[in-house]
Amino acid sequence: MKSISGNKISSTLVLLLILMASCKKNSGPSEPGNNNNNQTSADSAYHPVDPPVPPTIGFFNDVWSGKTFVAPASISGTVPNSPVTDSLFIDLNEVVVKVPMSVYGNNSNLWMGQMVTQPGLIQYIKDLSPHIIRAPAGSVSDVYFWNGTDAHPAPDDAPANLLDAGGQSVTANYWYGGNNASWTFSLSNYYALLAQTNSTGIITVNYGYARYGKNADPVATAAHLAADWVRYDNGRTKYWEIGNETYGNWEAGYQIDLTQNKDGQPGLVTGELYGRHVNVFADSMRAAARQTGATIYIGATLYDKAPAQYDYASVQGWNQGVLSQAGNAPDFYIVHDYFTAYAANSGVNDILNSANSVPSAIMNYLKPQIQTAGLSVKPIAMTEWNIEATGSKQNVSYIAGIHAAKTIGSIIKNQFGEASRWDLANGWGNGDDQGMFNIGDEPGASLWNPRPAFYYLYYFQQFFGDRMVEDNLKPANADMVSYSSSFSSGQAGTIIINSGTQNHIVSIDFKHFPAGPKYYWWVLTGGTDNRDFSGKVYVNGTAPSGPTGGPLDYASLKAYSASLNGTIRVSVPPLSVVYLVADKK
């Protein structure tokens, strides 16, 4: 055995120490203060590569545009010096998806008044910036005649009575577009609302009429009525839905009076029947669009989950029937989901957990079904979503706001092409009100007072960029979730949501980001009223202007800011959302 000289031993030890130090430095999370200022040029080189547009988004991103972040007025915020509980790493070069603006949509309805005569409400909607506002009104769409007037609300072949889910005859109560009464919403004012709020539309045509119409060919007649609307629209609206929740036993046309039907339709709607009818509607509507030189996209309704054994007949096999018969006639598919158990007094955990689980479950269910039918995956639009919880004023609480922010992030991550929350305004119902604004019947609240969900979605768009990027949150527990983004103007952002009851200190490190001198953030928290479901939201500690909702001077509030000298540290309080943007160099 040969001996080793002292010089060789010394050199070997030095090399080993260097290697060990290098391994230690790169084997775990960076320590606070060791990020941006110590990056190599490669670490701060911002060269994002956009992935292909996912088929579930498709043409909804044809109108994609970059976002420019404008730094808000700010005051110095407190940077926590407590130990870090969670570490967030964000890679600006790893683009998950270019964010479709259409995921921020909302729903109008026919009972919230003419709206365009309400400048305060219009300003709130402009600030919310939904991009898409759906019409005419959920299930009412299947008893709505867009060209009806006071003198002639519905066609002569529309029956005076319809069958309900139990097969009982009930008064039809048709709605119509030419109704200019103050309590409803005319079609002309729907178009005016879109213009005043810089929004586009998504319109649901009356499919129910194809079922309950009494003429010799009700399907062709209903399709012709839809095509006439396309002509009247004259290119203003690109996105059209054939019926609302057409599988639903609550919808007009689910069950028809066979003694009045003249084309041999079955008593109950099926997926196969609807799929065949989709072809008729699509042909008529596309012909109308060609006549006006417009481009339109037509959607068909699918059921968004596996039916339970106890579900009624029409739901069983609905998707297979639609897909087999409609084929390639639809341009996109429509789903609705209200996330929590129907009419249940759901708790905080059930509500907030659903925001993550439901969008991914929908995609995991639908895509294989479409492919099994031998069809290509197409854009998927969730044109109604909210929570179904009742009994504790959950819908008007800040928990519904956290759920809204968490859901939008999940919808983007799961690559939906469109999403419209239900709805702009509805009715108090002792706090079971899904409306974003008070229609005027909430005790003690001002007319059109924004509910907490408004604030959570307003700041989401302010501080979420045009590209979702990869992030890696190493959380202390499952309560934490993050959604990160970049702006075309160069800034980086993240939204951190704490669904639990413990305070968290989160460190944030960026990769491939030439960081600037400052970062800005907002913290949204709830109040102490109404137990778990406070009707108040505080924005950076600023209290609501009234007994419920949030601060009405939200547009002029100052963000928190701090110097960006390395790793960012931010406190995320219990049951809160933090919206943060780091400036560019």
Positions of the model-derived regions?
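Bacterial Sec-dependent N-terminal signal peptides
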Residues: 14-54, 58, 63
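Aromatic/acidic polysaccharide-binding cleft in carbohydrate-active enzymes
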Residues: 382-464, 468-482, 488-489
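Noncatalytic carbohydrate-binding groove/subsite architecture in carbohydrate-active enzymes
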Residues: 270-404, 414
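N-terminal catalytic cores of secreted or lumenal carbohydrate-active enzymes
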Residues: 48-328
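Carbohydrate-binding surface patches
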Residues: 477-529, 575-581
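Flexible loop/turn segments at secondary-structure boundaries
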Residues: 111-115, 140-144, 210-212, 247-250, ...
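Acidic, Ser/Thr/Pro-rich beta/coil linker or hinge segments at domain junctions
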Residues: 513-568, 572
